[in-house]
Design a protein with these regions (language model features):
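N-terminal secretory signal peptides that target proteins for export/translocation
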Residues: 1-8
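Transmembrane beta-barrel domains of Gram-negative outer membranes and organellar outer membranes
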Residues: 29-33, 37-251, 256-265, 273-328, ...
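N-terminal signal peptide c-region/cleavage motif recognized by signal peptidases
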Residues: 20-22
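Sec-dependent signal peptide recognition
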Residues: 8-16
Length: 366
């Protein structure tokens, strides 16, 4: 027993001495394995593992993909996965912030009576058979819209257009007409389910118009026997426009928009009293976007129609617009395209006219 106890007492220190060695022996392969990348990094610093950067906060989109189809960022003009394509004759029922420009040029013809020289100083020009008078047209516009709340927005539109007679007879009859207008409006909108959105809008428009009436000026000069004749007719119009707007997106590639408005313009002519008119406006649009179906073809088309009709005995003059648009749809924050507008209207409220205009349209959404 004493011998066994002496042997155990001798083995305990030996075991205690072996434990650190065994621990070092097990750790050696791991250290050797871990040292391989370190050695490689020492030989080639480019292969060294780089520390991972901090993860992007939730909800933050890579700036390189802002507005593109690859992101989950939802545009304020998006409904049920469909990003609506704008048209200059349609008001969208979306609360959004955007800046837009449009510029267009075109031509057309107006139908009116021909001028017959009578030789009578009291009535030097008399109307003859109707004929067509060609004209050229120019137009521009700036659109600024601000999203105040999720359901409330305000907008400011500034624009103008001009019609110029083309040719000697057209210059005499049509002359030159220049119009400018500023539109200030507010809109309250709200979603109805997933596929619909409705809005109520109220706009106030003010704009002057200048008409250079060459034929009337010549007739007045002969009739009055004086060259001091004012050939410039000036008017100013103040218009109230309340309306209801709606949008429907049954599929991500298809959308429809509808506008119904009441129009009440009050016009003041130079040297005469004011007069008021009433009218109504109905406009609709259907747009088709290829991007959700074929991402390699980021283009869309829109077809829109707008009718301005008289209301009551003192109604406005009827105007029809038929609009076709081709737009780039690769970015949700950009609407860029060409619009072709066919318009039936009256120049100077007397000459029935038909005109075709090509417009360049750009709108950026923030």
């Amino acid at each position: 027993m004493l011998g066994g106890f002496s042997m155990a007492r001798a083995l305990v220190p030996a075991v205690l001495l072996l434990l650190p060695a065994l621990a070092l022996g097990q750790a050696a392969p791991e250290a050797k394995a871990d040292s391989a990348p370190a050695a490689a990094a020492a030989l080639d610093p480019g292969t060294a593992a780089k520390p991972a950067g901090p993860a992007a906060p939730a909800g933050v989109v890579d700036p390189r993909t802002w507005g593109t189809r690859e992101t989950e960022w939802k545009s304020h003009r998006e409904l049920a996965g469909h990003v609506f394509i704008p048209s200059f004759i349609i008001q969208e029922p979306f609360s959004q912030t955007s800046f837009g420009l449009k510029f267009g040029f075109g031509s057309g013809s107006a139908t009116g009576p021909s001028l017959v020289w009578t030789g009578n100083p009291s009535d030097p020009l008399a109307p003859g058979p109707d004929k067509d008078y060609p004209f050229n047209a120019l137009g521009f516009g700036v659109n600024v819209t601000a999203r105040i709340l999720e359901w409330l927005s305000a907008r400011l539109l500034i624009g103008g257009d001009a019609y110029l007679g083309s040719g000697r007879d057209s210059i005499l009859v049509i002359g030159t007409q220049v119009k400018a207008a500023a539109d200030l409006g507010v809109m309250a909108s709200f979603p109805v389910g997933e596929h619909f959105r409705l809005a109520a809008a109220f706009d106030v428009t003010y704009g002057p118009a200048f008409n250079v009436l060459v034929a009337e000026g010549i007739a007045s000069a002969i009739r009055d026997g004086t060259a001091n004749v004012d050939v410039l007719n000036r008017t100013s119009t103040f218009t109230w426009i309340p309306g209801l707007l709606g949008a429907w997106a049954p599929f991500p590639f298809l959308g429809a928009t509808l506008n119904l408005q009441f129009v009440h313009p009050s016009t003041t002519e130079t040297g005469t009293s004011s007069f008021s008119q009433n009218g109504w406006s109905l406009a609709g649009a259907v747009d088709f976007d290829l991007a959700p179906l074929v991402p390699a073809v980021p283009f869309g088309v829109i077809v829109a129609y707008k009718l301005l009709g008289p209301l009551g005995s003192t109604g406005v003059t009827r105007t029809d617009n038929l609009d076709f648009g081709l737009f780039y749809t690769g970015r949700k924050d950009l609407a860029l395209g060409l619009e072709f507008d066919l318009r039936w209207f009256h120049i100077q409220s007397e000459l029935a006219s038909t005109g075709t205009t090509v417009l360049f349209t750009m709108r950026y959404y923030f």
